[in-house]
Amino acid sequence: MFTLSYKINTSPQTSDSYSTYNDMHAATDWEDFLKRLYDLNNDGSQNTTEHTFQADYTTPIGKIHTLEAGAKYILRDNSSEDDRYERQIGTTGDYVLDEEHSSHYKHQNDILAAYMGYGLRVKKISGRLGVRYEHTKQEVKYLLGRGDDFNKNFDDVVPSASIGYKLTDMSNLRFGYNMRIYRPGIWYLNPYLNDSNPTNISQGNSHLDSEKSHSFNLSYSNFTQKFNINLSARYSFTNNSIEQVTEQVKDTEIEGLQNPTGKEVLYSTYQNIGKSRNASLSGYVNWNATSNTRIYANLYGNYTYMEGANGLKNDGWNLFAYGGAQQSLPHDWRISLNIYGQTPWIMLQGKGSSFFDYGLSVNKSFLNKRLTLSAFASNFFKKYTSPTSSIEGVGFTQDSWNRYTRQRFGVSVSYRIGELKASVKKAARTISNDDVKSGGGEGGGGGE
């Protein structure tokens, strides 16, 4: 089978924040620090656009062998425009663009990958070996603000292997190894110096390398008409993980900071300094209670040990739970209820926040199920959430509190064109780009 695929994806984000000062008082030795402050308006926009081209070929050889090969080309363009406006404290005039301390930045990744795989199936035993080569061309341009343009190239060989055993017609046991590459997203890379809080300054790092993670996984699955169960145990390690690093430094040491005074402030950025070890257990259960009722749950527990090249260490547990129910009603109505939550997540210098959310959706189908109208709402009894985080370093402890809304309300409309027939075969390979490390918004630059 030969498959050609194309996918386009774009993720625009905007931010607009204001920092103003009133009734400022300070000890005598901090008066110079107060004089450098301005009312600020940070107007930012970030965007990532991906074009992916993929070709896959799979062929059986005899009854027990399978060969596969393919290639993928990703054009990933990251862009960020952060404009800084300021005005004198205590005035009501217009904000004026500070072009010197604004930042317009482009980061382009061209990724070319090719893979080969071999599969074997003998009675109840199956196995697979694979290898993938990736070449990454990275180009960084500073269109406005401080920074030197540069280019970097990476070459990686990514192996994988797995073996499975068919316990029964409905259950399987599988063990596998794979290496994964996680490239930093725009929030990690954005070099904009965010000093809207002059005592807690943050900035991304455009010189970050990709993470390389190695993982071993043992899984058990069982599928019946009533129950679907999947259990897995996993161990992974990374020797160059991207971690947020917060230090207490004199503001004169921060390159590009406007009017430094020599006072000590907190400075956060990202570095490839981390060594992480993760052991996890997870389980998924789906119960078809009746022909119209489905109940499902997903549980995940993870123990993490982290160590930085600067001597920092941290470890701890993190738990995540997701569950819900779906009920089909007469006249093509369907209702779904979901709940999910997580305990505080572990960082190199502290821990993040826990959360608990819930959501409800209602769907109605028309025109022989061609047209579907949906309405959804999440956290409708809780308008605001107040996440916290804690960071510790040499000579300081930082506790952060935020408050924002997590309520979501929406509607959607979908219409199916054409007929769904059993003779229409689904592609064996589809495009999945999961190589970008998520997160990074808290400590990086780019507005708030």
Question: Each predicted region: which residue ranges?
Answer:
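Transmembrane beta-strands of outer-membrane beta-barrel pores
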Residues: 8-14, 59, 73-77, 122-124, ...
